[in-house]
From Swiss-Prot:
One of its GO terms (biological process) is glycolytic process. The active site is at 100 (electrophile), 172 (proton acceptor). This is Triosephosphate isomerase. The gene is tpiA. The keyword Transferase does not apply.
């Protein structure tokens, strides 16, 4: 089964709602329409930007999709500061990032919480982008494959085959996020192949063949084609390189060249 690559920008805590409009406009207009037939292009934006991006995308019928960077595991109630999946669904979010290493580190998010957030998203028709990845000491010890497979298993706990079919996994080695260090294409392939093997175990060959596994961690326009060209890497979760619309369009075009 041919998997259409997904290039998803993770803006993190950058760009206000006015800047968001300009960035998405530049992205959409800088990427020729035929490229959208080869790759899916998305932005995951701060909560305060979502409504502005939705209005632009739907009003101008842009091919870019959008989503959020986190979601509550709860549906509603006395959870100050939280945003529910149903609220995101009302804004027509297609995606939500869960379990990013920055959430795991700064907010002490566990694999169990990540799985609950993924479940909440799926229950509201939103595809979670479930992030996993090893720290430097695990990589240096040579146990990174086992570590990431087990982390992925726990972060997907409770999801059935249908839910897994609507899930995206992003492999982001923690030591490569925002550091300028990039895992080699072979490194990315090694871990993504192992993740796909886990999905075979959990949900069968058909789901595993259709599920998209992204690489994240200092992805740049110059490196994306080689990484996405690997047999088990189906796109990228892009941080800093997604903050400039035209530069992100170039990155997506380079990914499309190997699709």
């Amino acid at each position: 089964m041919a998997r259409k690559p997904l290039i998803a920008g993770n803006w993190k805590m950058n760009l206000d709602h006015q800047q968001a409009i300009g960035t998405v406009q530049k992205l959409a207009f800088a990427l020729p329409k035929e490229y959208f037939e080869k790759v899916d292009v998305a932005v995951t934006v701060p909560f305060t930007d979502i409504r502005s991006v939705q209005t632009l995308v739907e009003g101008d019928k842009l091919e870019v999709t959008f989503g959020a960077q986190d979601v509550s595991q709860h549906e509603s109630g006395a959870y100050t500061g939280e945003v529910s999946a149903s609220m995101l669904a009302k804004l027509n979010c297609s995606w939500v990032v869960v379990g990013h290493s920055e959430r795991r580190e700064y907010h002490n998010e566990s694999d169990e919480l990540v799985a609950a957030k993924a479940k909440a998203a799926l229950s509201n028709g939103i595809s979670p982008i479930v992030c996993v990845g090893e720290p430097l000491e695990i990589r240096e010890a040579g146990t990174h494959v086992e570590y990431v497979v087990e982390q992925t298993r726990k972060s997907l706990a409770g999801l059935d085959a249908t839910e897994l079919a609507n899930t995206v996994i992003a492999y982001e080695p923690v030591w490569a996020i925002g550091t300028g260090k990039v895992a080699s294409a072979a490194d990315a392939q090694e871990v993504c192949k192992a993740i796909r093997g886990l999905i075979v175990e959990l949900a069968g060959d058909e789901v595993a063949e259709g599920l998209r596994i992204l690489y994240g961690g200092s992805v740049k326009a110059e490196t994306v084609a080689e990484i996405v060209g690997q047999p088990d890497v189906d796109g990228g979760l892009v941080g800093g390189a997604s903050l400039d619309g035209e530069a992100f369009a170039k990155l997506a075009a380079n990914a499309a060249s190997v699709a």
